[in-house]
Every structure is written in structure tokens, then in C-alpha cells.
A protein has these predicted regions:
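Positively charged n-region of N-terminal signal peptides that target proteins for export
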Residues: 1-7
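Bacterial N-terminal signal peptides
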Residues: 7-16
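Non-catalytic cap/lid and distal C-terminal segments of serine-dependent acyl enzymes
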Residues: 21-276
Length: 276
């Protein structure tokens, strides 16, 4: 009899644990700046209905990707929503927007992510509606985007991250549609200089923004990430900097995103987040 009871208790416990699963939805958002609907994946913890206001991590995709990349190519990462009691939002950032606002009215992704999307999420979900409850990160183009948007909108985001980010665009003038967005570097050097992350460190003061940067040693963006790390050190800007063996690929990002979300959770868990 005791053996049967033990087996029953084990089964109940197992079912209770395995029944917890983050809720993954695809929603339509609207950008007034670009006059179009844009899809986003919204991940909520299993107990969202009974929970209070919770923090949000905005997780950006890379060049040629879309809103579904993280869910499809990093299976299991969404469990962090349950583990850390947070929401994760994966917006569509266009094929090659680099998350800039440009002269092209169809590429206003800085406005979309930092203003329109944040407003949409705050209006539809139980979120902490200030920078203490918002973080942003991403991979490659999205790593650039995470830092670019957070550096420029420190009133919106309290923490920022980058995985394999293109944090200095200038060495790559002919790659990844950047010239389509900014014009040719040879003819528009000033625009390029003003829109590369490494030239925006002057916007930071120590302890105003929590920052984590991660890049594999075999990544073609490793050199520019090293340079950004040195610039942050020179300016005494606290940040976490992770270098591991690895290249510019999904096996690396599947691992890296776990560290990013842990870092963001630690930021959210502070009694008082840094304020500008």
C-alpha cells in the first residue's frame, strides 16, 4: 500500500511540474510610424493569470530573421519566462532594418520598438510600466539593436544586452543592407558615425544602464566587441563581458541567451534599479 501511495505522489508531483509551460502567442501590433501591422511573439509565464505586474525582456532577431526565429531556433529558451517570472517579447524587426529610423518611411524600427511596441505591450499586458521592468537584447543585428535602442532610450530600458552584436558597423560598409538604410559609407560617413553603437558610449554614465555583452572568439564581430569592451572600460562604465569559444551561429546563441536572461532577471530583482 505504501509503495502505491509513493508512486501516486510521484506521479502527481511529476504532472504538476511538467504541466507548467510558458504561454507562447503570436500577436499583431500596429506601427503608426510605418503604417503597417507587425507581428510579435509574446511569451508569458504559465501563472500569468494569477500573477501581478511583471518585467519584460524585448528579444531582437538578427539580419534576415523575423519574429519567430527565437521560438523556432532556440527551443526551450521560453522556459525562462516561468523560471524568472518575466515576459519575453520577440518583435519582427524587418529583414535588414538594423533597428534604425531612416529616411525610408518603411524603416522606422527605432520608433516602433522603443515607443510603439512598448506602449502596445504595456497597454495589453500586466507589465511593470517603467525602465525598472524593461530590458532589451538580441543577436547580431539585434545585438546592435539592443544596445543602440537602450543607449538612446535610457528612460525606457533599464538593462541592455548584445549577443554577437554588430556593435561597430563601419568595418562592414558593403554588408547586410546597411548601405541601403544609411546610404553608402563613402558618401554618408557622418550618418554612419552617428549610428554605430561604439560611438554612442558617451551617452552613458556609470551605473545608469545595466549592460551585458557576449561574443564568441571565432565570430567575425569579435574584434568590434573587444573594442567596445575596451571603450566601456576606459570610460568606467560597468558591464558584464563574456567571451567563449564559438562562432556566429545558433548553437552559440542557444547558450548565450540563457546568460542574458539570467542577467536581466538579476537586474529586475534589485530593490532599486539604476535610474538616469
Amino acid at each position: 500500500m505504501n509503495k502505491v501511495l509513493l508512486q501516486l505522489l510521484f506521479l502527481i508531483t511529476f504532472l504538476a511540474i511538467t504541466s507548467q509551460a510558458a504561454v507562447v502567442d503570436t500577436v499583431d501590433t500596429y506601427s503608426a510610424a510605418m503604417k503597417k501591422n507587425i507581428k510579435a511573439v509574446v511569451i508569458r509565464p504559465d501563472n500569468y493569470a494569477s500573477a501581478g505586474e511583471m518585467p519584460v525582456v524585448y528579444l531582437l532577431h538578427g539580419y534576415s530573421g523575423n519574429y519567430a526565429d527565437w521560438v523556432k531556433r532556440a527551443p526551450g529558451f521560453e522556459k525562462a519566462a516561468d523560471t524568472f517570472q518575466m515576459m519575453i517579447v520577440c518583435p519582427d524587426g524587418g529583414f535588414g532594418s538594423w533597428y534604425w529610423d531612416t529616411k525610408d518611411p518603411q524603416f522606422q524600427y527605432e520608433t516602433y520598438v522603443s515607443k510603439e511596441l512598448v506602449s502596445f505591450i504595456d497597454s495589453k499586458y500586466k507589465t511593470i510600466k517603467d525602465r525598472r521592468g524593461r530590458a532589451i537584447t538580441g543577436l547580431s543585428m539585434g545585438g546592435h539593436g539592443g544596445l543602440y535602442l537602450a543607449f538612446r532610450h535610457q528612460d525606457v530600458f533599464g538593462a541592455a544586452g548584445s549577443m554577437s552584436g554588430g556593435v561597430d558597423i563601419r568595418p562592414f560598409p558593403n554588408n547586410w543592407d546597411m548601405a541601403k538604410r544609411l546610404g553608402k559609407y563613402s558618401e554618408n560617413a557622418k550618418v554612419w558615425e552617428e549610428n554605430t553603437v561604439i560611438n554612442m558610449v558617451h551617452l552613458l554614465t556609470p551605473n545608469t544602464l545595466s549592460i551585458i555583452i557576449d561574443c564568441g572568439k571565432e565570430d567575425f564581430f569579435f574584434g568590434v566587441n573587444e573594442n567596445l569592451h575596451r571603450e566601456l572600460m576606459y570610460r568606467n562604465i560597468p558591464h558584464d563581458y563574456i567571451v567563449r569559444p564559438g562562432a556566429h551561429n545558433w548553437p552559440y546563441w542557444n547558450n548565450a541567451v540563457q546568460y542574458q536572461l539570467l542577467f536581466m532577471n538579476n537586474f529586475f530583482s534589485r530593490k532599486e534599479a539604476p535610474v538616469k
